[in-house]
Amino acid sequence: MSFANTSSTFEDKMCEGNRTAMASPQLLPLVVVLSSISLVTVGLNLLVLYAVHSERKLHTVGNLYIVSLSVADLIVGAVVMPMNILYLIMTKWSLGRPLCLFWLSMDYVASTASIFSVFILCIDRYRSVQQPLRYLRYRTKTRASATILGAWFFSFLWVIPILGWHHFMPPAPELREDKCETDFYNVTWFKIMTAIINFYLPTLLMLWFYVKIYKAVRRHCQHRQLTNGSLPSFSELKLRSDDTKEGAKKPGRESPWGVLKRPSRDPSVGLDQKSTSEDPKMTSPTVFSQEGERETRPCFRLDIMQKQSVAEGDVRGSKANDQALSQPKMDEQSLNTCRRISETSEDQTLVDQQSFSRTTDSDTSIEPGPGRVKSRSGSNSGLDYIKITWKRLRSHSRQYVSGLHLNRERKAAKQLGFIMAAFILCWIPYFIFFMVIAFCKSCCSEPMHMFTIWLGYINSTLNPLIYPLCNENFKKTFKKILHIRS
């Protein structure tokens, strides 16, 4: 890893003694394997960068952090790994001090940028889950880019001690020109401090963030289950609409739910069929005004049937009044209310029209003559029912949008979990060994140290493989670029 540096493999005298023995033809198979890992790392990270650049679906704020991580991994695979292999097969560093400092700078900067990229990615996922509405206003590409630039800026601060350590501290007395190592390679306190700040502290914070993310997603899932248990789903509304139709045909049966219809499929209920528009989305229901005139009003349909009782002022139950009735019976009176409501939620507009139909008993007569008390209770009840139904629809719309958001965050949390798991498993062995060497120089084991270093480098190879496993858009784009048929 950057903080001890690849060349720290040969920092200690005990490790240096093993270095010459490793430079032999027997290293050829190892060099081939390590070179293959380097090439695969470069190829996969270039594939990720090209996929994000070419596919518009991947142009998201969250993927900007993935791009930052891929750039850091690309530097590791294209610069750090090859020069590590080159130094492994050489008996001494013969490429000059400037190239050595360049390699050390790339090692430290790229490795630190990789850690910080995972860290800010974790913070982004954490805020998206914990504060979805508040953070949504601030989660822009500009702010994400500024955060990424800040992470890379702090990573580039490593250049100061690498190039200018001798300006602040006296140079190491044992520094040799035939070795590629930093001026602070033997400063234990500085190495421990940088390891804590650049690895242990961010890793602990990431683990804490991820625990919070896991609990938040789990809490949202439980809340959604409880909400779905108390309110009907859209499919339940459709099933209950069928029950409402049957209730309208059978006297004495009441249905508490409205009928939610698709205008292009279901016929209207309680409306004059001749007045229906040919447009599958628009209808022209018949409306009876207070003066008894017949009107036609265009509107979008959302038919709601509810059986209402006839007001006492409209019913004359006595036999004398029945005999005095001079006009024919009116078996059905339709009170229609059309309302167009629109609400935008994630670029989707919900347009609803609600129609209230009241049916009287066939044996009930209504007297239109003078002195008749006209009750408006049916109309008021219809409007109240429209408000209740609208609240239900609005609640379901929010639940649907919340469900989409929850699914996205669940997948993002899963992707972050895999990235963090690979990161910790690959780098924790090196840093444990690094801390041991810092306190016990005689404990250096050359093969083990090299193994932990390259295990950390392999993390840059694994990251591009994690993205398509956890993101369907990445998977489809990779298949499209590589011409792989599903």
UniProtKB/Swiss-Prot annotation:
<feature type="modified residue" description="Phosphoserine">
    <location>
        <position position="381"/>
    </location>
</feature>
<dbReference type="InterPro" id="IPR000276">
    <property type="entry name" value="GPCR_Rhodpsn"/>
</dbReference>
<feature type="binding site">
    <location>
        <position position="112"/>
    </location>
    <ligand>
        <name>histamine</name>
    </ligand>
</feature>
<feature type="disulfide bond">
    <location>
        <begin position="100"/>
        <end position="180"/>
    </location>
</feature>
<protein>
    <recommendedName>
        <fullName>Histamine H1 receptor</fullName>
    </recommendedName>
</protein>
<keyword id="KW-0297">G-protein coupled receptor</keyword>
<feature type="topological domain" description="Cytoplasmic">
    <location>
        <begin position="51"/>
        <end position="64"/>
    </location>
</feature>
<keyword id="KW-0675">Receptor</keyword>
<dbReference type="Pfam" id="PF00001">
    <property type="entry name" value="7tm_1"/>
</dbReference>
<dbReference type="GO" id="GO:0043114">
    <property type="term" value="P:regulation of vascular permeability"/>
</dbReference>
<feature type="region of interest" description="Important for agonist binding">
    <location>
        <begin position="107"/>
        <end position="112"/>
    </location>
</feature>
<feature type="transmembrane region" description="Helical; Name=1">
    <location>
        <begin position="30"/>
        <end position="50"/>
    </location>
</feature>
<dbReference type="GO" id="GO:0045907">
    <property type="term" value="P:positive regulation of vasoconstriction"/>
</dbReference>
<feature type="binding site">
    <location>
        <position position="430"/>
    </location>
    <ligand>
        <name>histamine</name>
    </ligand>
</feature>
<feature type="modified residue" description="Phosphoserine">
    <location>
        <position position="342"/>
    </location>
</feature>
<feature type="topological domain" description="Cytoplasmic">
    <location>
        <begin position="212"/>
        <end position="415"/>
    </location>
</feature>
<feature type="topological domain" description="Extracellular">
    <location>
        <begin position="440"/>
        <end position="445"/>
    </location>
</feature>
<keyword id="KW-0325">Glycoprotein</keyword>
<feature type="modified residue" description="Phosphoserine">
    <location>
        <position position="395"/>
    </location>
</feature>
<keyword id="KW-0597">Phosphoprotein</keyword>
<feature type="transmembrane region" description="Helical; Name=5">
    <location>
        <begin position="189"/>
        <end position="211"/>
    </location>
</feature>
<feature type="binding site">
    <location>
        <position position="198"/>
    </location>
    <ligand>
        <name>histamine</name>
    </ligand>
</feature>
<dbReference type="GO" id="GO:0007199">
    <property type="term" value="P:G protein-coupled receptor signaling pathway coupled to cGMP nucleotide second messenger"/>
</dbReference>
<keyword id="KW-1133">Transmembrane helix</keyword>
<dbReference type="GO" id="GO:0007187">
    <property type="term" value="P:G protein-coupled receptor signaling pathway, coupled to cyclic nucleotide second messenger"/>
</dbReference>
<feature type="topological domain" description="Extracellular">
    <location>
        <begin position="90"/>
        <end position="97"/>
    </location>
</feature>
<feature type="topological domain" description="Extracellular">
    <location>
        <begin position="165"/>
        <end position="188"/>
    </location>
</feature>
<dbReference type="GO" id="GO:0048167">
    <property type="term" value="P:regulation of synaptic plasticity"/>
</dbReference>
<dbReference type="GO" id="GO:0007186">
    <property type="term" value="P:G protein-coupled receptor signaling pathway"/>
</dbReference>
<feature type="binding site">
    <location>
        <position position="107"/>
    </location>
    <ligand>
        <name>histamine</name>
    </ligand>
</feature>
<feature type="topological domain" description="Extracellular">
    <location>
        <begin position="1"/>
        <end position="29"/>
    </location>
</feature>
<dbReference type="GO" id="GO:0045202">
    <property type="term" value="C:synapse"/>
</dbReference>
<dbReference type="GO" id="GO:0007613">
    <property type="term" value="P:memory"/>
</dbReference>
<feature type="transmembrane region" description="Helical; Name=4">
    <location>
        <begin position="145"/>
        <end position="164"/>
    </location>
</feature>
<feature type="modified residue" description="Phosphothreonine">
    <location>
        <position position="140"/>
    </location>
</feature>
<dbReference type="GO" id="GO:0030425">
    <property type="term" value="C:dendrite"/>
</dbReference>
<feature type="modified residue" description="Phosphoserine">
    <location>
        <position position="345"/>
    </location>
</feature>
<feature type="glycosylation site" description="N-linked (GlcNAc...) asparagine">
    <location>
        <position position="5"/>
    </location>
</feature>
<feature type="topological domain" description="Cytoplasmic">
    <location>
        <begin position="124"/>
        <end position="144"/>
    </location>
</feature>
<dbReference type="GO" id="GO:0005886">
    <property type="term" value="C:plasma membrane"/>
</dbReference>
<feature type="region of interest" description="Disordered">
    <location>
        <begin position="241"/>
        <end position="295"/>
    </location>
</feature>
<keyword id="KW-0472">Membrane</keyword>
